[in-house]
Amino acid sequence: MSRPAESAIHPASNLLPGFDHKKLRTTGADINYAVGGSGPPLLLLHGNPLTHVSWHKVAPSLAERFTVVIPDLRGYGDSSKPDGGEDHSAYSFRAMAQDNVELMRSLGFDRFQLAGHDRGARVAFRMALDAPQAVSRLAALDIVPT
């Protein structure tokens, strides 16, 4: 089972007061994330070409009522950039969704609320389809249908 790494000083610390910055090795990638607050778990997924820091204006306020988890999707920010392979499956929405289900489980959250922006919303939809038992609510922001 994956385990969270120890906290480290992160350059974004001043933008996310009260958040701990950590890394987790999932099945397919090393995921950089920040976690803060207390209450029901809320996972926020950023869009393209952003990082977890894109939530810095709302995450501290949300952390007053929720345990907020904000990762860098694989390939973004300080998360690892695995080889995509010929079919690019390492960067599929399914692979990114699995990373984040593993992340939330490693933090003790088998069920959580989820919000995604842009690419993060696509990952959120995939997660709700692949792991419906994990997602209690889903909000999608700025997503273009394909």
Q: Positions of the model-derived regions?
A:
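Tryptophan-centric aromatic hotspots in well-structured domains and transmembrane helices
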Residues: 18-21, 51-52, 119, 125-126
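Conserved Rossmann-like nucleotide-binding pocket used by diverse enzymes
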Residues: 20, 41-44, 69, 115, ...
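Conserved HGGG/HGGXW glycine-rich cap/lid loop of the alpha/beta-hydrolase fold
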Residues: 29-82, 103
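Conserved hydrolase catalytic core segment
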Residues: 65, 107-146
